[in-house]
Amino acid sequence: MNKNEIETQPVTWLEEVSDQNFDEDVFGACSTNTFSLSDYWGNNGAWCTLTHECMAWCK
């Protein structure tokens, strides 16, 4: 693999999320935790879970 191939490889989902600052970009003054994420995605419960927010069949 040469240098150009390394630089042009796609960014993974985890790398993209890790590079973001959710406290300023999405949630303003809120701290980024499971509760604020859960509220942002419309869950009125106490926990942010992939099964509730991201999977339609689990709602």
Curated annotation (Swiss-Prot):
An example GO biological process term is: defense response to Gram-positive bacterium
Q: Locate residues linked as Beta-methyllanthionine (Thr-Cys).
A: T49-C54, T51-C58
Annotated positions of the 2,3-didehydrobutyrine modification? T32, T34
Give a short account of its post-translational modification: Maturation of lantibiotics involves the enzymatic conversion of Thr, and Ser into dehydrated AA and the formation of thioether bonds with cysteine. This is followed by membrane translocation and cleavage of the modified precursor. It is not established whether the 2,3-didehydrobutyrines are the E- or Z-isomers. In the NMR model they were assumed to be the Z-isomer.
Instruction: Name the Gene Ontology molecular function terms of this record.
Output: signaling receptor binding
Give the UniProt entry's GO cellular component terms. extracellular region
Where is it predominantly found?
Answer: secreted
Q: Which UniProt keywords apply?
A: Antibiotic, Antimicrobial, Bacteriocin, Lantibiotic, Plasmid, Secreted, Thioether bond
Q: Which residues carry this modification: 2,3-didehydroalanine (Ser)?
A: S36
Protein location:
Secreted
Query: Cross-link Lanthionine (Ser-Cys) - where?
Result: S38-C48
Placement of covalent cross-link Lanthionine (Cys-Ser): C30-S31
Report the protein's function.
Answer: Lanthionine-containing peptide antibiotic (lantibiotic) active on Gram-positive bacteria. The bactericidal activity of lantibiotics is based on depolarization of energized bacterial cytoplasmic membranes, initiated by the formation of aqueous transmembrane pores. When present individually lacticin 3147 A1 exhibits strong activity towards L.lactis strain AM2, weak activity towards L.lactis strain HP and no activity towards L.lactis strain IFPL359, but when combined with lacticin 3147 A2 it displays strong activity towards all three strains.
Q: What is this protein called?
A: Lantibiotic lacticin 3147 A1
